[in-house]
A protein has these predicted regions:
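Anionic N-terminal interaction surfaces
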Residues: 1-24, 37-42, 78-80, 85-93
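Phosphoinositide-binding peripheral membrane targeting modules
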Residues: 11-18, 23-66
Length: 93
């Protein structure tokens, strides 16, 4: 199951890009050259996800992904409901 979601990473501003979901990883990608290489192609193994929470930033839908080793990443995701459904399927299959 490969899915693509339009998303922005909330890290030192709002960094537009996309989240790619496959059966093993969530990968956030942006083409902004002013962003650290770490965040231009941020790969998060699904097995390392501890928690996914949803919320809002102003009126935008957000998702916070908490990983092992105290890493947390907040994203604005425009199809949040579908993203959460996809993640629920992957994490519990």
């Amino acid at each position: 199951m490969d899915e693509i979601f339009i998303a922005s990473l909330c890290k030192n501003g709002i960094l537009g890009g996309a989240i790619y979901v496959d059966k093993n990883h969530i990968t956030y990608r942006t083409n902004k050259l002013t962003v650290s290489e770490k965040y231009r192609n941020l790969k998060m193994p699904i097995k390392d996800i501890i928690e996914i929470t949803s919320g809002r930033m102003l009126f935008f839908p957000t998702v916070t992904i908490s990983l092992k080793h105290d890493y947390k990443y907040k994203f604005i995701i425009f199809n949040k409901k579908k993203f959460l459904s996809t993640m629920n399927e992957l994490r519990h299959s």
